[in-house]
């Protein structure tokens, strides 16, 4: 009898964690899309994981997964095409 109670309690906790993680993921994705649409300079989500260089954590190069990945990077973060062009123009060219 006691083992059935522990089994039901464990399943209930696992189910509650599953639901709360789904809700948290949905809230995070809504927050991310709202922030990207308000900024206007970014090209959607997908920033983050950089090429790991062999070992360690995975992730694609520049983290631009499926649709709407970042196309321009300024100091390691996503930026608009105009910002990338301005940054490139502002960088000092070495004189050889």
Curated annotation (Swiss-Prot):
InterPro entries in alphabetical order: GRP
Domain of life the protein comes from: Eukaryota
The Sequence repeat ranges on this chain: 42-50, 61-67
Coiled-coil intervals: none
Recorded family membership: Belongs to the GRP family.
Function: May be connected with the initiation of embryogenesis or with the metabolic changes produced by the removal of auxins.
UniProt name for this protein: Glycine-rich protein DC7.1
Record organism: Daucus carota
Lineage: Eukaryota, Viridiplantae, Streptophyta, Embryophyta, Tracheophyta
